[in-house]
Amino acid sequence: MALWRSSDNMVYLPPPSVAKVVNTDDYVTRTGIYYYAGTSRLLTVGHPYFKVPMSGGRKQDIPKVSAYQYRVFRISLPDPNKFSLPESTLYNPDTQRLVWACVGVEIGRGQPLGVGLSGHPLYNRLDDTENSPFSSNKNPKDSRDNVSVDYKQTQLCIIGCVPAIGEHWAKGKSCKPSNVQPGDCPPLELVNTPIQDGDMIDTGYGAMDFSTLQETKSEVPLDICQSVCKYPDYLQMSADVYGDSMFFCLRREQLFARHFWNRGGMVGDTIPTELYIKGTDIRDSPSSYVYAPSPSGSMVSSDSQLFNKPYWLHKAQGHNNGICWHNQLFLTVVDTTRSTNFTLSTTTESAVPNIYDPNKFKEYIRHVEEYDLQFIFQLCTITLSTDVMSYIHTMNPAILDDWNFGVAPPPSASLVDTYRYLQSAAITCQKDAPAPTKKDPYDGLNFWNVNLKEKFSSELDQFPLGRKFLLQAGVRRRPTIGPRKRPATATTASTSKHKRKRVSK
């Protein structure tokens, strides 16, 4: 009896087509017009470990300013479509729009190189596990100590037209909350959030939410024990479809472990008995195996500096090749090589005592930072064809709204009520409803706002970064003062008459 059976050969179907993301160079035309823009000296001063609230006669808080915080600058640029251009025939406002492209940047850092310390007066350290003479698991109940460390050394620069994305580990949710008992290890969850100005960086203790995952408040130094340390999510930003969050990045990290300790407290996960052989006396039961090193960033040197030098953007890592959508730029900076903390001392008496008494002096600590930002922007045009506008609308409809393009609503078929006496008290108030204000998409996020709308200049040779740009571009500047050589006039060969020779007879 013959039976039918399906073929063993597998048939592979082609994958479904996906919408193609094009590079900005495919629909953005670059012009030969460049502008320089730069900030004044940017300074910030504060307490390196925590925010000091108002007290006594002080009417303002002292902010937390640490070298281990992200500095995120939100840079506002002028609208090029309302810009005074040198050539009126540069573009057609009916069919084109102008945008800025960032082609050069230099991040200036002031202040000398230095190493700043952080620590905790009640740091959770039990034993020196590198060379411990004995186990102290049966020693005092509180083994915390005053410890200071020098954090991991980090230099970082991320530039894009949207904020950079950070990642950290936070306390997750259990599938069965009713089964969670006090003292159980919480589940972990990877969280992605925008990096804001003032967020703490990874200092060598990991990117995590210490306020919810370390309830002893003594596992890490003071400045991060109740904070969230974020690490840039390079994987997500590199895989960004449109490449807006990271045109390019510069980073340098350095770390080694200086001391090796274990943590005090009850060990939550017991060591399996098959992993060791029991001892006697103080070795009857193992001590805490929850080991934790103290990080160190080691030596700082001017040979490994990423700042105070120009960078030119020729090709971005993503599809956005430096186009500043919404006329703004986000610059994320970290520099721990200038982390010196100032220690200040003042006397509590009217005059400085002649004999030192520590009870007559107060000690304070402060941290200062200094920045100088310079940019080179290139003017670009976009021809508003149907395909380009459709693509931009799919990418970000707010861009077309900024260009005064919008979708016209369909005509209304319903009747509209119109009253005769608008000022009459017999009818409802006829005041027009206020126009809805445009909401900032980054409302509620903290950035260092920098306004460059009135600081653009086309005289590149008048600024340090502009001269460097002209040098690398191979452009020779023309002299503006002093004597100029006149162009040589073309000389025509004069026709000389042949003289007759006298012949002697």
Swiss-Prot record:
HAMAP family assigned to the protein according to its UniProt record, in alphabetical order: PPV_L1
- Compositional bias per record (Basic residues), positions renumbered to this chain: 496-505
In terms of SUPFAM superfamilies, this protein maps to: Group I dsDNA viruses
Please give the organism.
Answer: Human papillomavirus type ME180
Described by its record, this protein's role is as follows: Forms an icosahedral capsid with a T=7 symmetry and a 50 nm diameter. The capsid is composed of 72 pentamers linked to each other by disulfide bonds and associated with L2 proteins. Binds to heparan sulfate proteoglycans on cell surface of basal layer keratinocytes to provide initial virion attachment. This binding mediates a conformational change in the virus capsid that facilitates efficient infection. The virion enters the host cell via endocytosis. During virus trafficking, L1 protein dissociates from the viral DNA and the genomic DNA is released to the host nucleus.
Belongs to which family? Belongs to the papillomaviridae L1 protein family.
**Location within or outside the cell:** Virion; Host nucleus
User: Its encoding gene is what?
Assistant: L1
Recorded GO CC terms: host cell nucleus; T=7 icosahedral viral capsid
The name this protein goes by in its record: Major capsid protein L1
Entry keyword set: Capsid protein, Disulfide bond, Host nucleus, Host-virus interaction, Late protein, T=7 icosahedral capsid protein, Viral attachment to host cell, Viral penetration into host cytoplasm, Virion, Virus endocytosis by host, Virus entry into host cell
GO terms, molecular function: structural molecule activity
Record-level GO BP terms: endocytosis involved in viral entry into host cell; virion attachment to host cell
